[in-house]
Amino acid sequence: MKPRHFVTLRDLSSAEFRALIARAIDLKARKEPYEPLKNKVLGMVFEKSSTRTRVSFEVGMAQFGGSSIFLSPRDTQLGRGEPIEDSARVLSRMVDCIMLRTHAHRTVEIFAEYSRVPVINGLTDRFHPCQLLADMQTYFEHRGDIAGKTVAWIGDGNNMCQTYVHAAGLLDFRLRIACPPGYEPEAELVEAAGKCVEVGHDVRTAVNGADLVVTDVWASMGQESEQTERTGAFRDYQVNAALMALAHADALFMHCLPAHRGEEVSAEVLEGPQSVVWDEAENRLHAQKALLEFLLTA
């Protein structure tokens, strides 16, 4: 039987997505020891450095009674040019699950195609589904179901934005995206999402009456050479107190971190009462524990 993978949110049904959110909330509240993954091993392949992804997966496996192995390009033949499919075949004969944080989304797709065990997308250039599990858990904890609500995405139409496009369809919320011309999410993703997703360039229109406001860095890892150009393009796309004032009175603010205060978000908003970024960061642990349990014990 082929394993279940988590390459994008589209690998889940709406019901499964909601069940994972509920399970993550339950696991967060659980105090007594619980080790459903005893003697299981998670292989973690990192092409890009990370704080939250590595720590949350390692701690999650330890709390579940399992263990994890960290593999950087220096530690594997992948870094020396071994075909991706060969690495997938070999690793999946030795570990129980593989998580990859890579540059190219195609790398994760190939791993999933050739792996004998579940493959998890820990982040690629196109999608970041693990972060959306945590984001949605955080919203449900603070405000209840997100169905019928309005989410405003401000800034780059990047991997996070594109994962929000998937989430909007699965959880039935309205997504309004405001980004500079030339930085929109992939057109085919937006078209496939239908009426629940709108793309424009005016931040005020996007945020007006929103229940959740989300942003991300202007230049992601690997885009450092574009920093000056992007700073100019995004200068009018900062989430600050004046912009948040246009949102719903009890709107929340999220950012997947790390944040650059004074660029994509003001320090006042990041540290303010509407910000739930620290809960959001913590929930990477709980949401991914729910995901690991789902993939490895079903």
From Swiss-Prot:
Residue ranges of coiled coil: none
Cellular compartment(s): Cytoplasm
Annotated binding of carbamoyl phosphate, by residue: 50-53, 77, 101, 128-131, 256-257, 284
InterPro entries, sorted: Asp/Orn_carbamoyltranf_P-bd (IPR006132), Asp/Orn_carbamoylTrfase (IPR006130), Asp/Orn_carbamoylTrfase_sf (IPR036901), Asp_carbamoyltransf_Asp/Orn-bd (IPR006131), Orn/put_carbamltrans (IPR002292), OTCase_ArgI (IPR024904)
Catalytic EC class: transferase
Single GO term (MF): amino acid binding
GO biological process, one term: arginine biosynthetic process via ornithine
Residues involved in L-ornithine binding: 159, 216, 220-221
Record EC number: 2.1.3.3
Tagged with keyword Transmembrane helix: no
Pathway: Amino-acid biosynthesis; L-arginine biosynthesis; L-arginine from L-ornithine and carbamoyl phosphate: step 1/3
Pfam family, one: OTCace_N
Swiss-Prot/TrEMBL catalytic activity: carbamoyl phosphate + L-ornithine = L-citrulline + phosphate + H(+)
Superkingdom as given in the UniProt entry: Bacteria
GO cellular component: cytoplasm
UniProt KW keywords: Amino-acid biosynthesis, Arginine biosynthesis, Cytoplasm, Transferase
Database matches in HAMAP family: OTCase (MF_01109)
Function: Reversibly catalyzes the transfer of the carbamoyl group from carbamoyl phosphate (CP) to the N(epsilon) atom of ornithine (ORN) to produce L-citrulline.
Family: Belongs to the aspartate/ornithine carbamoyltransferase superfamily. OTCase family.
Protein name: Ornithine carbamoyltransferase
Gene this chain is encoded by: argF
